[in-house]
A protein has these predicted regions:
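Basic- and aromatic-lined ligand-binding clefts that recognize polyanionic substrates
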Residues: 33-54, 145-201, 272, 302-312
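C-terminal motif of bacterial Sec signal peptides marking the signal peptidase cleavage site
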Residues: 18-22
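A short, structured surface patch at a secondary-structure boundary
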Residues: 39-102
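Bacterial N-terminal signal peptides that target proteins for export
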Residues: 1-11
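Flexible loop/hinge segments that line or gate small-molecule binding clefts
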Residues: 68, 103-139
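Structured C-terminal subdomain patch of bacterial secreted/periplasmic proteins
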Residues: 38-39, 128-133, 138, 147, ...
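Bacterial signal peptide processing site
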Residues: 24-27
C-alpha cells in the first residue's frame, strides 16, 4: 500500500501542507500574570473561535471566509491560515501567535527567523482541541472558561455514547476530495477520528502518524467498508464534481458492497474538515443519522454527474 506523499503532485502538496506535518508538541509557557501585556494573534478560524470562547483579547485575526466573532470584527487581518503574512505579524509585535499544529512545519521556520513567538495547538481530534483549551486556560488565567467548555464536551460525548450503546459498529471509509483527486482519512486526521469517536470502525489504519493516505481503488476495495463517506477540502464544489465523475465512470466502484447497497453519503465539508471546531457535536449527530439511524438520503453520483455535465 502506498502512503500519501507530498511529492505526488504540486497541487496536493499546496492544499495539504497542513495535513502532512508531523505532530508538534505543545510547549505552553509559564502562566501569564495579570500585569503582563498580551498581544495575541489567532491564525485560523478554528483558533479564532477558541480564543473567543475563552474571552481572550486579540490584536489581529486571520483572513477567513468564516464568521468572525463580534469582539474581533474590525481587527487587522494577517492573511489566511495556510499563508499568514510573517512580516505583518512581526510588525504587530505579538506576545503570542496561536495556530493549529498541522501548519507548524510550513510556517514555523519563517516566523522563527522573524522572532515571532508561536503557540501550536492540537486540532486533529476533539480531545486534542480540549487539551489545548485547558492549556490556554492555564496560560492566560482563563481556568473557569476552559473548565466550562471541557465539562460541556464531556457531558455531550457521554450523552452521545449512551445513545448508541449496544448498536453494531459499522466499518467506514471516509474520502476527502481535492480538485482532481481524493485521499482517505486515517484515524489521525480530524475527520477520520470522528468515525471512531462515533463508535464505528475506520477501515483505513496506518502504523505511523499519517493523517491521510493515497491508496488505489483496488486497495480500498479490499477493505470492504459498510459505509463510504465523502467530504472535501479546498475548492469543495470542484472536489464533489470530481467524486460524481469518479463514482459514475470508474467501474471498480460498482464492486464496492457499500456502493451496491447505496451506503455512500456526502458530508458537509464545513463540519468534516481538516481541523476540529466547536461543530463537532453536529458532526457526531450527522454520523449517527447516517450509520445508525439510516435517516439520511444516500449520495446519487450518477444524478450529480449528469447535472454537472448539463450545467444545471
Amino acid at each position: 500500500m502506498h502512503i500519501w506523499r507530498k511529492t505526488i503532485a504540486l497541487a496536493f502538496s499546496t492544499v495539504l501542507a497542513l495535513s502532512l506535518s508531523s505532530c508538534v508538541n505543545q510547549h505552553p509557557a509559564a502562566p501569564i500574570s495579570a500585569a503582563e501585556e498580551t498581544r495575541i494573534i489567532a491564525t485560523s478560524n478554528a483558533t479564532l473561535k477558541i480564543c473567543d470562547k475563552l474571552g481572550l483579547d486579540l490584536v489581529a485575526i486571520p483572513t477567513t471566509i468564516g464568521t468572525v466573532p463580534e469582539r474581533y470584527q474590525g481587527l487587522p487581518e494577517i492573511g489566511t491560515a495556510m499563508a499568514p503574512d510573517a512580516e505583518q505579524i512581526a510588525l504587530l509585535q505579538p506576545t503570542d501567535v496561536i495556530g493549529p499544529d498541522t501548519l507548524a512545519e510550513s510556517i514555523e521556520p519563517t516566523d522563527q527567523a522573524a522572532g515571532v513567538p508561536y503557540t501550536w495547538i492540537d486540532l486533529q481530534s476533539v480531545k486534542g482541541m480540549y487539551d489545548s483549551i485547558a492549556m490556554l486556560g492555564e496560560k492566560y488565567g482563563k481556568h473557569s472558561e476552559a473548565q466550562t467548555l471541557i465539562s460541556q464536551y464531556e457531558e455531550t460525548l457521554a450523552e452521545f455514547h449512551r445513545a448508541i450503546k449496544g448498536v453494531e459498529a459499522p466499518r467506514v471509509l471516509m474520502l476527502m476530495g481535492l480538485p482532481g483527486a481524493y485521499i482517505a482519512c486515517t484515524p489521525n486526521s480530524y475527520a477520520g477520528s470522528l468515525i471512531d469517536l462515533a463508535g464505528a470502525e475506520n477501515v483505513v489504519q496506518v502504523d505511523d502518524e499519517m493523517n491521510f493516505v493515497s491508496w488505489n481503488t483496488e486497495e480500498l476495495l479490499a477493505l470492504d467498508p459498510d459505509v463510504i463517506l465523502l467530504t472535501a477540502h479546498g475548492l469543495p464544489e470542484q472536489a464533489m464534481e470530481m467524486f460524481s465523475k469518479e463514482f459514475s465512470t470508474n467501474d471498480i466502484w460498482k464492486h464496492f458492497r457499500a456502493v451496491q447497497e447505496r451506503q455512500v453519503y456526502q458530508l458537509d465539508y464545513q463540519i468534516f474538515g481538516m481541523s476540529c471546531t466547536f461543530d463537532w457535536p453536529k458532526a457526531l449527530e450527522t454520523l449517527k443519522e447516517i450509520i445508525y439511524d439510516k435517516t439520511v438520503e444516500p449520495y446519487d453520483a450518477e444524478t450529480a454527474y449528469a447535472e454537472n455535465k448539463s450545467g444545471t
